[in-house]
Amino acid sequence: MPKYRSATTTHGRNMAGARALWRATGVKDEDFGKPIIAVVNSFTQFVPGHVHLKDLGQLVAQEIEAAGGIAKEFNTIAVDDGIAMGHGGMLYSLPSRELIADSVEYMVNAHCADAMVCISNCDKITPGMLMASMRLNIPVIFVSGGPMEAGKTKLSDQIIKLDLVDAMIQGADPKVSDEQSEQIERSACPTCGSCSGMFTANSMNCLTEALGLSQPGNGSLLATHADRKELFINAGKRIVELTKRYYEQDDETALPRNIATKAAFENAMALDIAMGGSTNTVLHLLAAAQEGEVDFDMTDIDRMSRQVPHLCKVAPSTQKYHMEDVHRAGGVVGILGELNRAGLLHNQSKTVLGLTWEEQLAKYDIMLTDSEEVKSFYRAGPAGIRTTQAFSQDCRWDTLDDDRAEGCIRTKENAFSQDGGLAVLKGNIALDGCIVKTAGVDESILKFTGPAVVFESQEDAVDGILGGKVKAGDVVVIRYEGPKGGPGMQEMLYPTTYLKSMGLGKECALLTDGRFSGGTSGLSIGHASPEAANGGAIGLVQDGDLIAIDIPNRSISLEISEQELAERRVKQDELGWKPANRQREVSFALKAYASMATSADKGAVRDKSKLEG
């Protein structure tokens, strides 16, 4: 039977000093011997998705202590990708994922904590905590801060739903008046919570549900809704049960690696494809799988992308539906229920509730359950009141959205498309693959061939797009923006947004070894691997080269001969794989990150082989 990790610091005469320090934190005589559970919070006033988390750690802590544990809270950093976007700050976003994972490991191992509750929400925080959880493999439950309410405003006598991306597009569109742009800006982000569409933050919080590491509603229940408080309360209670199951009953099914198995990762990826989630989730799932030694890679994602239909269409792929609408339609459980009925779910995988997915669907799927309590839970809706307070309202929709033919969530037979919402493309320009969010691509450009317009940085691309260098029919290539080449693999939301504002959203393609915001739509292909800085063929493209994209056949190719490609490679080897004439200040911290970063097909994790020998 495993021994409590915390006993290392709480038992024996030689630990008198450690016990003295524990006592100084409030631990009493009768507490020694109880499990020490880390409450890993990520409160910050910099990020709307985290601004309301300050008191929620102590809410969880109270429940842990009432259930017989010792709760100790600490915080991680949290970068707001939207605020860091479009300037040098974005270089720090992806590297912060590794920093978060490491800091959780440092705190938990330094103090010998027995288990964790991870309070996350936004883009790199959930993935960083997930990586740490799989690395440490101690009992864990995730509970996120929840999504923001969708913005709403009246334009042309019609109420429309808004989000951050709408504010960016309107702000860059010269045809939009200053007054309208300001109106959109003031309405786009009305409450605390992660941005209201199926962007990276909400995608990842949904995926923790599918992995089995969080409770029903975690990914979709609004941050402002009173019902969300129960998720935090229940997390505190449940983590003590899981902890005692493992340490006192030798039940290894309570450990994250035995919950988030390969089957669970396939469930999460199936959900991601079905809901047209952010392409960033591919990076993060691959990274988490590596941390947990789960055999899950791009080959699995490619296979699944050909099998799973697109069942749920949400902003930024449509303005009609946001996360509040996904919740009304049954949330993550609703989507997984449709995948199960289509034979596309591993329904014997287990969750932190101790149930198989088959059992959990029977209890929480609005299409199966008779429980009025569950149905009321999924009717939790927005209040439309600006606030930074969690649990501040208890509004409910009059009805659920159980229309599986034309509603927010659909059956396989009524899918938005039988082809899923994400696809892996391969070809001579991306031998190890690249990713496109097909949910956001107009059907008219699923096949696209055009001349390359090459930029060595995101900044140059923005200047080129706004300066008229890019024309209808072009393929914009932005390179040396990968994990190593950036460094930090910036998001290309501004280039894609400006293509839309210039009327080119359906007239151009964009290819990059960087990545995209979850708010991106259009023919935007990212994660080209190997990246340019690692000798990838994207570094060999020249202005005017034809690039052929064929999403239905999962291919992308540079239309030049193999001989020409080989000759260019010889020349580039001599020059070195570096961006030409790019002036960018890179700090020591970012250089250290770049020195070990792998390309996107490996999850942009650190290359452990560099530590061997």
Swiss-Prot record:
It is an enzyme of class 4 (lyase). This is Dihydroxy-acid dehydratase. One of its GO terms (cellular component) is cytosol. Homodimer. Coiled coil: none annotated. Pfam families: ILV_EDD_C, ILVD_EDD_N. Its EC number is 4.2.1.9. The modification N6-carboxylysine is found at residue 124. Binds 1 [2Fe-2S] cluster per subunit. This cluster acts as a Lewis acid cofactor. It comes from Vibrio parahaemolyticus serotype O3:K6 (strain RIMD 2210633). GO terms for molecular function: 2 iron, 2 sulfur cluster binding; dihydroxy-acid dehydratase activity; magnesium ion binding. Its cofactor is [2Fe-2S] cluster; Mg(2+). Belongs to the IlvD/Edd family.
